[in-house]
Amino acid sequence: MTQPIIELHQVTKRYADNTILSNINLTLESGKFYTLLGPSGCGKTTILRTIAGFTDATTGDILFAGKRINDVPANKRNVNTVFQDYALFPHMTVAENVAFGLTLQKRPKSEIAERVNQALRLVQLADYGDRAISALSGGQQQRIAIARAIVMQPQVLLLDEPLSALDAKLRRQMQYELRDLQQRLGITFLFVTHDQEEALAMSDEIFVMNQGEILQSGSPVDIYDEPINHFVADFIGESNILPGKMIDDFQVAFGGHQFECADAGIPVNEPVEIVIRPEDLTLTDLAHAKLTVTINTQLFRGDYYEIAATDGLGNDWLIHSVNPAEDGDQIGLTFRPQDLHVMRFGEKEAEFDARLETYEGTEDDRFDET
């Protein structure tokens, strides 16, 4: 682990009796792309504002490179923020907007010109310095807002839902550009979004939030494949979440049947929830089925069919298949043991991580495909 650049220790934020953040612990390393992901009102922007110095923490410590900065004013912190509305000045040219912070610092004109030109080159708008803000597209304005932030040479760049105002095609393009920019700059990005696709596509690490708490942190693959609870599983991508019961290590029951799984360390007969991603289900004939479902409806999504079905116990199923099915037909489903993920009710992240460590690697031996 490299030297942390930002640390939050037991940070709480309250307004009267309303708790916005509850005992937030968070560590950001230098040179990585992090995302705070959660629904509106979960506290993710408050974390951003607390790090930036725009909002004071009620309790807890905020550290920058190991030093407490709770009392350091926003303009003295080596972080910059890109806001959702970009906050560009319409009466200034592009270059004047980018130079604004340097001008306030009374930097020499030659230095300002050099750094502005460098920042515009980094966001691929080198020839736009003399243009008016009103002449720019939404994507160009967003890049100018980023240039205005990085021209200050921050060690941390905070981005508060900067892609939310863009159309779907441009938003996807900007995901590539932001990730590429972060890697070229080599600084820490902390990105705020409610869009799961953005978080999964760009991040080195994701913090999933709800109701003022960080529920789970980890790589996009870890968060997607090993959600800690119902909220995370449902919020990150599409899921089939079913009630079940743990039979033994690597054995779980749901849907009226018992199946081999990749989870262990859970007491026998404990009620659990099982997650199966729609893309991990395969349609098959009834003779080879692990479960039988009745097709309700389907939608063609371009590269796959999204099929809604119901099993004999009334559980709803969502299946992604390259092959179509007929409405009303009974059809079989099959899946691999490692495609089942078992979730315990009320399990905290530390408990979840400790349980996984006790049997980590054993499931790979059990399900090694040779």
From Swiss-Prot:
It is an enzyme of class 7 (translocase). The gene is potA. Its main location: membrane. Part of the ABC transporter complex PotABCD involved in spermidine/putrescine import. Responsible for energy coupling to the transport system. Its EC number is 7.6.2.11. It is found in: Cell membrane. The lineage of its organism: Bacteria, Bacillati, Bacillota, Bacilli, Lactobacillales. Residues 6-236 form the ABC transporter domain. It is a peripheral membrane protein. This is Spermidine/putrescine import ATP-binding protein PotA. SUPFAM superfamilies: MOP-like (SSF50331), P-loop containing nucleoside triphosphate hydrolases (SSF52540).
